[in-house]
């Protein structure tokens, strides 16, 4: 336990929780402190000036990160016939209709992202209580209810990241791995921030992007000057 506390203290050295730093410096600090024995995920958290309890202040969307996420994303597709074949050919790991609904209702969810053709939604709607809390419910607004299942599968595996503001007005997402080059992380972060800004709801008043921070899975958060992300 003493060794763990010492390691945590060492990782946190040089990180001032009250100081805002430029994006490039923040990336360097986070990468230097990603010392776990696995390839840590680099995560971004954005505090927004919205209250998602109001429908006109909800923020959600999807962004294709230019350099991918570094994750091996397992995709499930609810489809029948030719569209099911199309999904398999595109690389979807799990494809089905009524049979897949039964599997998910039984508690087996061995996928990270879920796609459905429009005709399947009355069936998939039964899974709202299971998929909804996990942020996996297919939604046409983020391109996961579509007839272009091949395109959706490829996007999911190629770096598509969904985002949705939480109750406290925070959006967070994984935007790469510690092994990524600094420039690749910077490009991903700016692409993510740009998508969040473009998704600004009509009901948002005042300062929209209030705070931004990045961190690795096991490392401390580093606060970023919002202007270096949103410029």
Curated annotation (Swiss-Prot):
UniProt cross-references to CDD domains, sorted A to Z: Ribosomal_L1
GO cellular component: cytosolic large ribosomal subunit
PROSITE patterns to which the protein is assigned, alphabetical: RIBOSOMAL_L1 (PS01199)
GO biological process, one term: regulation of translation
Keyword Repressor attributed: yes
GO molecular function: rRNA binding; structural constituent of ribosome; tRNA binding
InterPro entries in the cross-refs: Ribosom_uL1_bac-type (IPR005878), Ribosomal_uL1 (IPR002143), Ribosomal_uL1-like (IPR023674), Ribosomal_uL1/biogenesis (IPR028364), Ribosomal_uL1_3-a/b-sand (IPR016095), Ribosomal_uL1_CS (IPR023673)
Keyword field contains Manganese: no
Keywords tagged on the record: Repressor, Ribonucleoprotein, Ribosomal protein, RNA-binding, rRNA-binding, Translation regulation, tRNA-binding
Assembly notes: Part of the 50S ribosomal subunit.
Job description of the protein: Binds directly to 23S rRNA. The L1 stalk is quite mobile in the ribosome, and is involved in E site tRNA release.
Family of the protein in this entry: Belongs to the universal ribosomal protein uL1 family.
Protein name in the entry: Large ribosomal subunit protein uL1
Species this chain originates from: Allorhizobium ampelinum (strain ATCC BAA-846 / DSM 112012 / S4) (Agrobacterium vitis (strain S4))
Gene name for this UniProt entry: rplA
């Amino acid at each position: 336990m003493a060794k763990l506390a010492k390691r945590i203290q060492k990782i946190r050295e040089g990180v001032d929780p009250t100081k805002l730093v430029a994006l490039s410096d923040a990336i360097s600090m986070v990468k230097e402190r990603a010392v776990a024995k696995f390839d840590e995920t680099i995560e971004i958290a954005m505090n927004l000036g919205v209250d998602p309890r109001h429908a006109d202040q909800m923020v959600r969307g999807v962004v294709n990160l230019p350099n991918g996420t570094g994750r091996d994303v397992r995709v499930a597709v609810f489809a029948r016939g030719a569209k099911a074949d199309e999904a398999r050919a595109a690389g979807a790991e799990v494809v089905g209709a009524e049979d897949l609904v039964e599997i998910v209702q039984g508690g087996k969810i061995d996928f990270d992202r879920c796609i459905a053709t429009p005709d399947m939604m009355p069936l998939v709607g039964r899974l709202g209580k299971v998929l909804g809390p996990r942020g996996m419910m297919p939604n046409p607004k983020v391109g996961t209810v579509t007839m272009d299942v091949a395109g959706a599968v490829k996007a999911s595996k190629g770096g598509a990241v969904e985002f949705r503001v939480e109750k406290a007005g925070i959006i967070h997402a994984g935007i790469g791995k510690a092994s990524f080059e600094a420039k690749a992380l910077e490009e991903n972060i700016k692409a993510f921030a740009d998508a969040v800004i473009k998704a600004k709801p009509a009901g948002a008043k005042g300062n929209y992007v209030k705070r931004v921070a990045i961190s690795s899975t096991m490392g401390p958060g580093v606060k970023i000057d919002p202007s270096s992300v949103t410029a």
